[in-house]
Structures are given as structure tokens and as C-alpha cells.
């Protein structure tokens, strides 16, 4: 865009006719570098060492220049003249192989090109040199000439060119054009492959044209192949490679990789400390031109304290670092920088900006300070873990960090380690007692406490100190027994009232002059007493070393000492009695039950036990008394073993053997042994059944008895259930007809007792079956009688049975008075019971008024005639 005149100059050069004389291309433009960006060599399948493949040409444009070549593929090497040789033997597995070649010139610039090896069989005009010392072919004098490939440098076309289009770039012309009519065409990217139609060539004149503006950022190189054919389509020349390189124009702004960059730096950092790196990209060319070279700078800094240039940025790398001292988080915790990225040779062409946020990290540059620095406290004596004071500090560093967390230490006044100080979650120092203070020992403590941080100071700082004055308060302390545990030795036969020990306590509160009273705190056996005034402990006369309350010959008694303070305080002392043994327990035998066989019984061993201690134990003597001496022999063997054996064969049964044992001092004790003689021989004991009969029932017998009892109870229960089932008979809802009875009750008795049910059963009616015939005149019913449901077998259907039959009876058209005319004045034959007519009512029949019967209708006419008419 801004290189209009250079384009015109380049156009003049590029439009210079390139004559291809005998296949040798001529050009006037020179550009340092390889003559081609790609070389193609035709090679056999097997690559042998020291074989020359071809030569790459480097254009220095400035006369002889020392060039060094190198191959990126270790199987090939490049000599100084550009000849490519095979270094290691290999095989061409594929039809082509590509590797890269580099060239360095004296100024340090590096150039590169690609070499493609093609297997034989592909159409190519490149010669293959036969040996390492082969020479390149040269033109000979005379008419004969040697042809070689078309070689032209890349054609440079600037991007973003203005029209009119198409624009001519270069003209291609074959040397055979004088002999035959030559037609030109191009193929490749930008011609017949996407993007198609960017380049076009005159079919007859060979002018290569560009048809539209180019964009280097889209495609920076186009590789085309020009073709020259005759009118019959035959190739006049081999296809020639044309490389069109798009020259960059500065048409793209730099772009930062982030809109906002974030970094951090510790406060107090020295100049040169790296903070962060910003980066930007530019789509323009930064290799051959300065269009894509980016230069960084700082446009603005906020806040501008302590100076407006606290940071600097490297113009090429974008590294931001500290420029000067004075970073202080407490004053300026964040800096905002406006960063500019500019391209061009002097960094003044296209620009863009971004923001860099730099957080100043806190360091421990502020000490914690006590507020206040003086503390006073009162602490009761003997209190452990008592909170003495809560020390507070202020710190300007960030709360919750190691630079803010306080660490307290007592540096003076705590030589006896009575106090400790810890930091709580609120950064407060909690001063507590770790041991009980003693008012009588020391009444006041003055402590010096310093405070630091968990993190070390980043700069030299002075620590803060606080003073804590602790006053000890006097409290009523319990009396103290000295020693706390006192041991005395007493004989277990100590007489009652005998002094065991004097066990007293001292009152720490000497200034209060209090009286101490002693009592027994714990005496499980009740063996001692204590004088409440002087602490003298006496025995109660019943000490026993062999008691269950004695453990390892010792007996413990707790003594309490209470002072007269208000409230009273009580101290505790332990009196340990070591009981001395006396010979008060006679020896006895274990076990006290044993069995012998009737035949060849042998002997049994018993253990002699004596609860006393030596020398009140062995040696022992054994004596059999009464009948036991006639049947048994007892011998003491060893210290505590007794052997017992029968003197003769005894009858089967139980025997009680009385043995008297005497210890070394003659203290005796009689043991009764229960011996069973069993029907067996020697050691084959068979005493189970006998022992069970003699000593009680065995387990199997007990189980059998219990099983029999349980079976009997079960049988009894089944019998009761059977009887109950037989008795419970479900009564029908209606009684049978043959059980219907009439009863005559006398209601004029108002008395009680049993007379109301004392009546003559013989006076009852004999029953409906024995009644005399009733005089009746039957009239045949006009309608059919209803069908009554028979009595169901299931008792649950009785209710339905009654309801249905009752309904049928209520609607029976054959029921009286429709079906019969009954004569009611016939009372039947004589009855064993008295006639009711003998019972006269207060008024006779003559006094009764039956005229109302006439109002009952024709159905009751006969009845009205009988009672309301004449005597006739």
C-alpha cells in the first residue's frame, strides 16, 4: 500500500522478458538465497553411499561469499559447492522423499530449501551425477549445446495491490516459438486449484497476470507450473515451476493474547525483580520485514505513587519488571498499567493496547503492636488452666496470613513455668496458669510478653512488649497430710483400743490459724477409729489378715482432715496397714469329695490348705478319728500333700472320713471327707449311677423327670379341651316344638325368698300334643299357602331363616280369620289344674260391657253375639 514506487521499479524488472534460449532462463533480478524453494532429484530405488544426487544453487548477489550447508536428514550431506551426496545407504520405500537443507552466510542469516527425491520412472530432466568427484557439465564450443531445467527465482508480488486487473507479472517465452506455434498454460494453486483464477497466462504471448489483490496472511506463496505445447498438443518444453511470493504490507494491527494481564510482586521488591510477561501477535511478516515486529511500551501507570515509573517493560520480550524501590502494599495494593504493542521498524506504525494488573503481595513488613501494653489480673491460688488475661495486638498486614498471625512469648517473670500463652483464632493472646499458684509462697508475678508473627519479618523491625501484673488471691486451702500415704505394720490380733498410728495434717493457711478435725473417710471393714482432735488411729479389735478386704496383706483406710474455714476445706490421707500374720487358721483339705473303686482302690491325693503364713503352716500332721481310723489310712507327704487309701475292701456306698490336721504349732482343724465306694476295679471308675443315687439325681435323670412332667401336663390340657368341646353345644335359636311348656305364675306374692319358685310341677299343662281337639269349622282357603323355608343346618343362617318365614307368615292369605271359624267357648276337657273360671274377678260377667264388640265389624259379629247378646 505504501510502496507504490518500489512496485513500479519491481514491475520494470519483472516485466523484463525472460528469454528461454535452449532451455536456459535469463533474468535480471537478484535475491540472496537458494535459487529455488524446492528442488527435485530423480533417484533409483537403492541409494548407495557417496552417490551424488544433484546440486542446490545459492545466489549471494554480492560476489563470492562463504556459505555453509547442512542437511536436516542425517542420511545426506551437502558439500561446499552445493552438491548433495548420499551419506548412509538406504532404500526408497515410497515414490518420493523430502528433506530440508539449510545455508548460513557470513552475516549469520539462515536460508533454507526443500529437496524432494523422486524414484526413477517419474518424468524429470534432472541429471544424476555418478560419483563424488563428478563435475557439473559445461557448455562446449561448437554447435552442440546441452539443455537444462528452467530456473527462475521466486517472483515477488505485493499484497493489497490496486487495479486495474489483470496486471502483468512476467512473460514466459520458449526458444521454440520461432520454429513452431507455442501455446502457454499454467496449473497449480491459484490457477486451476483453489483459489482458482487468481493467476492467468496469455495463451499465445505467455504473459502471466494476477487477476485480483493478494492477501499474504491468507496465502504467502503460490506454486505454479507453466506448460508450453505445440498446436497439436505435444509438449515443447518440460513444465517449469513458478513460485510467486506475496510481499507483505503492514495491514494488520498487533493483537494482545489477553485483554487484561494479571501478575503479582512482593512489596519491597528490589529493582529488576521480574513481575510478569505480556505478549502480542501480528499477522504481518516479521522475518523478512518489520511489519510483524512488535515493540512493547508502558503508556500509563495508576496510581502514580511513589513515582509514576515504578515498572518498566522490555521492548522485545514484553517482560515487566520493577524499576525502582518503594512498593508498599499497605499504601498501594494494586497497580494498573496500560501496555502498548506497536509494529514496524521503529515501533510507530500500527498499535494496540492492553491492561496489566499488578497486585502487590503482602510481606511481613509491619510488626504486631500491643494495644494496650499494660495488663493487671487477679488469680485465685491453686487454680490450673485459669484465664489470667487476654492480650490484643494490631497488625497492618493482611488479616489471616502468616504475616498477620501473632506469636506470643513470655520472656520474663515465668522462670518457674507457672504460666503459658497461646494464640486463639482472633489473634488474641490467652494467658493461662499451667500450675496452681500458692499465695503463701508468692503473692505477685510480673510478666513481660513479646509478640512476633508466624512469618519472619521481611525487613528489620522492632518487636512490641507488654507487661502483665498478676496478683494471687488467698483462698481456704485444704489441710495436707504428710506424707499423703502412710504405711504402718500391725498384728492382725491387735487388741481393741490399741494405737495403730498417729496421722495428722497441716493447714497451708498459716495466717488463718484454723482448727483441724479428723474423721474416717473409708474403712470398708470397720477395723479402726480416729481421734477427731489429734488424728490418733486405734484398732477396734477385729483385724483379720485373711479377710476379703485385705489385698496382699495390706488394708487401706482413708482419713479426712477438715479445717474450720468458711467454707470448710477437706484434705485426704491414705493409711496403709501391713497386717502381720498370727496362727489363727487351722489347715484343711481340698477337695472334700472323692471316689474309690471297691477292688484295688489305690490312693487319692488331697491338698492341705492353710490360710496362715509360714512358719504357722507346715510341717503338718494327720490323724483319723473314730471309725475312720479302722477303714482308712492317711499319710502326709511333702509340705501340703495328703494321701488317703482304704485299709481293706469296703462295701459299696457312702463314707464320711474324719481327718484332723495339725500345723507346725499344733493348731488343729477337722475336715470331713465324703468318700464314695464304687463297683469297679482299679482306676476304671464306674461311679456315675451310684453317685447319682447317693449324692442326688444326675442331669439325665432330671431331664427325664422334667420331660415326664411336661408330657403329663400336656395330656391333661388336651383332656380339658376335649371335655370343654363336648359340653359346648350350640343351642338352636328356636326351641323344638315338643319342649314348649305353659307356666302359671302367681304374681300376687310380693314376698321374697325361694317361695316364688316353689310351685307344683304337676299343675303344668301336659303339652300341646296331649291337648283335646278344638272345635273348629274349617273353610277351604281360596289362595295358595306360602312356601316356608325349612330349618337350615348351618346355625349362621338362622337369622335369615326367621326373617324370611316371618315375612311369609305375615303375608299368608290362608291365615285366620280367613281360613277357619274357631269356636272359642269350648274350653276342653277337665284339667288337673284348677279352672280359671273359679277365679272370680271383682265384677261378674254380667257387669261387663261388651257393646264395643259391635263396632269391630262383621268379622267379630259372632263374638259380639256371644258376649253382648241375650243369654240365648
UniProtKB/Swiss-Prot annotation:
Gene3D superfamilies per the UniProt record, alphabetical: Cadherins, TCF3-CBD (Catenin binding domain)
Residues the record lists as binding Ca(2+) 2: 251
Membrane-related topology note: Single-pass type I membrane protein
Residues involved in Ca(2+) 1 binding: 251
SMART domains in alphabetical order: CA, Cadherin_pro
Function description: Cadherins are calcium-dependent cell adhesion proteins. They preferentially interact with themselves in a homophilic manner in connecting cells; cadherins may thus contribute to the sorting of heterogeneous cell types. Promotes organization of radial actin fiber structure and cellular response to contractile forces, via anchoring of radial actin fibers to CDH1 junction complexes at the cell membrane. E-cadherin is a ligand for integrin alpha-E/beta-7.
Disulfide bonds: none
Organism: Xenopus laevis
Ranges of compositional bias, category Acidic residues: 747-758
Residues making up the propeptide: 26-148
Disordered: annotated segments: 739-758
Gene Ontology CC annotations of this record: adherens junction; catenin complex; cytoplasm; desmosome; endosome; Golgi apparatus
Coarse class of the protein's main subcellular location: other
Residues bearing glycans: 209, 456, 552, 631, 669
Entries under InterPro entries matching the protein: Cadherin, Cadherin-like_dom, Cadherin-like_sf, Cadherin_CS, Cadherin_pro_dom, Cadherin_Y-type_LIR, Catenin-bd_sf
Binding site residues for Ca(2+) 3: 282
Listed Pfam families: CADH_Y-type_LIR, Cadherin, Cadherin_pro
Official protein name in the record: Cadherin-1
Subcellular localization, as worded in the UniProt entry: Cell junction, Adherens junction; Cell membrane; Endosome; Golgi apparatus, trans-Golgi network
TM region positions: 702-722
Cytoplasmic compartment segments: 723-872
CDD domains: Cadherin_repeat
Record's keyword terms, sorted: Calcium, Cell adhesion, Cell junction, Cell membrane, Cleavage on pair of basic residues, Cytoplasm, Endosome, Glycoprotein, Golgi apparatus, Membrane, Metal-binding, Repeat, Signal, Transmembrane, Transmembrane helix
Gene that this polypeptide is encoded by: cdh1
Any one GO molecular function term: calcium ion binding
